[in-house]
Curated annotation (Swiss-Prot):
InterPro entries: UPF0178. Pfam families: DUF188. Disulfide bonds: none annotated. This is UPF0178 protein lwe1471. HAMAP family: UPF0178 (MF_00489). Belongs to the UPF0178 family. It comes from the Bacteria. PANTHER family: UPF0178 PROTEIN YAII (PTHR35146:SF1). It comes from Listeria welshimeri serovar 6b (strain ATCC 35897 / DSM 20650 / CCUG 15529 / CIP 8149 / NCTC 11857 / SLCC 5334 / V8).
Length: 149
């Protein structure tokens, strides 16, 4: 029997949950949202949510434990992305960029340098707010990926 991938979402700060649900429904894929108890809600609308301790990296650890080769991951966390890519998953950013293993070293280095700059008091702007166009682009990219898989 062929493995049917699931979509795992690093849900604490994910701005495209609605788009993920739409794509999952279209392709009949299971979605699992993983978030800390800080984001707990009794109103999950029948969705599959896993809530974890509020400790640093708790959601990441849970995602690493339940991810399987071939699963689709949505996260902004480059460190988590690099680990899950090594497990044979497909990792997308919240903006629909498909991370590639050969890019991870450079991306992790840039993240490290930015963290050092922040420690020195140099603050950079955060990411721009998600627009409707960004949401549409995310949905288009993940849909195209699944159609070609």
């Amino acid at each position: 029997m062929e493995y049917v991938p699931k979509i795992l979402v690093d849900a604490d700060a994910c701005p495209v949950k609605a788009e993920i649900k739409q794509v999952a429904e279209q392709f009949q894929l299971e979605v699992i949202f993983v978030a800390s108890f800080n984001h707990y809600s009794v109103n999950t609308n029948g969705e599959n949510w896993i809530f974890v301790d509020t400790g640093k990296e708790s959601a990441d650890m849970r995602m690493m434990n339940i991810a399987n080769k071939g699963d689709i991951i949505v996260t902004q966390d480059i460190g988590l992305a690099s680990i899950l890519l090594a497990k044979g998953t497909y990792v997308f950013s919240n903006r629909g960029e498909l991370y590639r293993e050969e890019e991870m070293s450079l991306m992790l280095d840039i993240r490290y340098r930015h963290a050092k700059e922040r420690q020195q008091g140099k603050y950079s702007k955060g990411p721009k707010a998600m627009s409707d166009q960004d949401r549409s682009l995310f949905k288009d990219r993940i849909t195209t990926f699944l159609q070609n898989k």
